[in-house]
Swiss-Prot record:
Keywords carried by this UniProt record: Amidation, Disulfide bond, Ion channel impairing toxin, Knottin, Neurotoxin, Potassium channel impairing toxin, Secreted, Toxin, Voltage-gated potassium channel impairing toxin, Voltage-gated sodium channel impairing toxin
Species in which this protein is naturally found: Cyriopagopus lividus
Keyword check for Disulfide bond: yes
Residue numbers bearing the Isoleucine amide modification: I33
Descriptive protein name: Beta/kappa-theraphotoxin-Hlv1a
Length: 33
């Protein structure tokens, strides 16, 4: 299962949902700009 918006993630390890990216600053999934 992919991680949704604002779900905690580890950059380069966890998979965020399509059109989302793991923020290395906040350590959560956010929308790609």
């Amino acid at each position: 299962a992919c991680k949704g918006l604002f779900v905690t993630c580890t950059p380069g390890k966890d998979e965020c949902c399509p059109n989302h990216v793991c923020s290395s600053k906040h350590k959560w999934c956010k929308y790609k700009i």
